[in-house]
């Protein structure tokens, strides 16, 4: 059933009149709405005897201007009314697309079957043989290489033996270190054991680590030798530098050489506190892991630090000699008194 509506296409004169009679935005929007209706009829290819649109632009121009709010409300209601119809049209479109894809797939499968029917089984086997021969030729071309680039010239069995020997050697080294650092008592009767899991933590007094360390007071050390230490950046004459106190200078030199610190600069007033902190830090690091300072190696004989040369007068030398004689006499008298006291 066709619906007929009295609407004509606007002529050229009407279009000129339309351009002259646009007093406000609301009327312009209304003109565009009517023009879109005319475009819709053309897209659907409806003849004039089915749908006919006639617009009298003169009468439309003489009408009072529409309120924008009224026009907006009417247009919004019309769009909301048309949205359900769009949703209804989407489902048959999807079904048509699915059907078309299935038909294309069936056509392709039929073409493949026809091609397979044309070729016999023997032809297919020959084609597979040709492919295999091509693959063998490719492998042969890839095998050719320069033998000089090979670093290890040994068979697979020899390479596997070397790898297994390397793994066993590393495991033995790790096991030895674990037993030495973690395990206190080794149970020889136990077949399966692990030094780290079976270890008994025995904290040493005054230390936080399981590695036993001891504090040693050395009167002289490896840093007292005059020649420079390789890799430390010290000059041979760096040991002769004095900060005013021989004991402080020796401790400073030992710590700086052990930590590979650059010497120099003024000595602060809290020098003893700094030395104490540095020594405690070194002891803590060695207690956590002895490997911290294993790279530091020293060679040569240990030599005492030579005190700075001083010039004394004859009177000062006589005083020192007399003081030394008195000290020796005092020690000898004390030794004699102790010996007589212990006699029965």
Curated annotation (Swiss-Prot):
Modified residues (Phosphoserine): 91
PANTHER family named in the record: MOLYBDOPTERIN SYNTHASE RELATED
GO cellular component, one term: cytosol
Region described as Leucine-zipper 2: 314-329
Function: Inhibits the MAP3K12 activity to induce the activation of the JNK/SAPK pathway. Component of the ATAC complex, a complex with histone acetyltransferase activity on histones H3 and H4.
Chain positions of cross-link Glycyl lysine isopeptide (Lys-Gly) (interchain with G-Cter in SUMO2): 94, 118, 129, 139, 153, 235, 301, 304, 325
UniProt modified residues of type N6-acetyllysine: 301
Assembly mode: Component of the ADA2A-containing complex (ATAC), composed of KAT14, KAT2A, TADA2L, TADA3L, ZZ3, MBIP, WDR5, YEATS2, CCDC101 and DR1. In the complex, it probably interacts directly with KAT2A, KAT14 and WDR5.
GO terms under biological process: negative regulation of transcription by RNA polymerase II; positive regulation of gene expression; positive regulation of JNK cascade; regulation of cell cycle; regulation of cell division; regulation of DNA-templated transcription; regulation of embryonic development; regulation of transcription by RNA polymerase II
Tissue note: Ubiquitous. High expression seen in the heart and lung.
Disulfide partners: none
Record GO terms (molecular function): identical protein binding; protein kinase inhibitor activity
Protein name: MAP3K12-binding inhibitory protein 1
Stretch list, region Leucine-zipper 1: 271-285
Sorted UniProt keywords: Acetylation, Cytoplasm, Isopeptide bond, Nucleus, Phosphoprotein, Repeat, Ubl conjugation
Stretches for region Interaction with MAP3K12: 172-344
UniProt lineage: Eukaryota, Metazoa, Chordata, Craniata, Vertebrata
Compartment annotation: Nucleus; Cytoplasm
């Amino acid at each position: 059933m066709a619906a007929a509506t009295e609407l004509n296409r606007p002529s050229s004169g009407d279009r000129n009149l339309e351009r002259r009679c646009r007093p406000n935005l609301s009327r312009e929007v209304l003109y565009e709405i009517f023009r879109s209706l005319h475009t819709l009829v053309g897209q659907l290819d409806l003849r004039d005897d089915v749908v006919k649109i006639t617009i009298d632009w003169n009468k439309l121009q003489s009408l009072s201007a529409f309120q924008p709010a009224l026009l907006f409300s009417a247009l919004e209601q019309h769009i909301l009314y048309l949205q359900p119809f769009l949703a209804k049209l989407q489902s048959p479109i999807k079904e048509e697309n699915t059907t078309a894809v299935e038909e294309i797939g069936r056509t392709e499968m039929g073409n493949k079957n026809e091609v397979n029917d044309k070729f016999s089984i023997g032809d297919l086997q020959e084609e597979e043989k040709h492919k295999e021969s091509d693959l063998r030729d490719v492998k042969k071309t890839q095998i050719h290489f320069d033998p000089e680039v090979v670093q290890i010239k040994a068979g697979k069995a020899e390479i596997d033996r070397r790898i297994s020997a390397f793994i066993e050697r590393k495991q033995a080294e790790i096991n030895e270190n674990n037993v030495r650092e973690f395990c206190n008592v080794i149970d020889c009767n136990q077949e399966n054991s692990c030094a780290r899991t079976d270890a008994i933590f025995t904290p040493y007094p005054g230390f936080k680590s399981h590695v036993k360390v001891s504090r040693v007071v050395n009167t002289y050390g490896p840093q007292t030798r005059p020649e420079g230490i390789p890799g430390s950046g010290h000059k041979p004459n760096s040991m002769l530098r004095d900060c005013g106190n021989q004991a402080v200078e020796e401790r400073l030199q030992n710590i700086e050489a052990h930590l590979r610190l650059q010497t120099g600069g003024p000595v602060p007033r809290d020098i003893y506190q700094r030395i104490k902190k540095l020594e405690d830090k070194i002891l803590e690091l060695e207690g956590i892991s002895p490997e911290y300072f294993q790279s530091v190696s020293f060679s040569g004989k240990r030599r005492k630090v030579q005190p700075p040369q001083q010039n004394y007068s004859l009177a000062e030398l006589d005083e020192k000699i007399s003081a030394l004689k008195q000290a020796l006499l005092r020690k000898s008298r004390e030794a004699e008194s102790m010996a007589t006291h212990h006699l029965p």
